[in-house]
Amino acid sequence: FAALLTAFGFYYAADSVAPVLFFCLAAVIIILGLGEEIYNDIYKDRLTGFASRNAFIIQSPKFPLKYSVGIVSIDNYDNLKKAFGRRGRKNLLQMISRRIVAAETEAVIYRYGDDELVLIFKNEDKNAAYEQMEQIRRAVASAEFMLSKSKKPVKLTISGSISEKKRSDANALEVLSRTRKALQKTSAFSFNVTSKA
C-alpha cells in the first residue's frame, strides 16, 4: 500500500504538494506496519499464536490476587527433536496447541519455552485449575497427530503441574518456579500426569 502511495506521488509530481503528501502517507503506513511487527514480536508467539514469554513477564504484575499457574510440558521432547526434525516438531507443537485451545479452558496461555506452555487460571484455586489441566492432558493424550511424511498417526502426551498463588509469593515468577519444580519432580518418575505443587 505504501508503494502505491509512492507511485501516486510520482504520478502527481507536477504539483509540488502532492508528492510530499503521498510520501508522508507512505512513511506513516510503513511506520505503523513496523510498529505492529514489533508488537507481535514482543507479545505473540508466531508458531502457536499464544502470547509469548515476554508477554507473561510484562503482564504478570497485573494478574488478580487469586490465580493459579499451570505448566504443560511435552513428554519426551528431546526424542521428538531427533525423530521429527525441526519442521516436524513445529507441526506437532501447532497441533498440540490447537488441541489445547479445543479443550475450551478459561486459562490465558503463554508459550514459555520450546516445549513449555504456561497457563494462568485467573480467580481459580488449584483444585479447579487442576481439573482443567487434567481435561487438557486427556485431550492431548487421546488425540492422534498426523504428520505429512508419517503414514501412521503419532501419539503424544503432555505432563503438567499446577500451583496456586500464596500470600507469601512476591510475584508470578515465584509461583511459576514452584510449579516448575513440581513438574520436574513428577516428570523424573512418570509421563502423562498432572501434579499439584
For each feature predicted by the language model, list its residue ranges.
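Catalytic core regions of nucleotide second-messenger enzymes
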Residues: 110-111, 140-159
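Catalytic strand-loop-helix junctions within cyclic-nucleotide turnover domains
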Residues: 120-129, 150-152, 158-175
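Signal-transducing coiled-coil linker helices
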Residues: 1-3, 7-46, 54-65
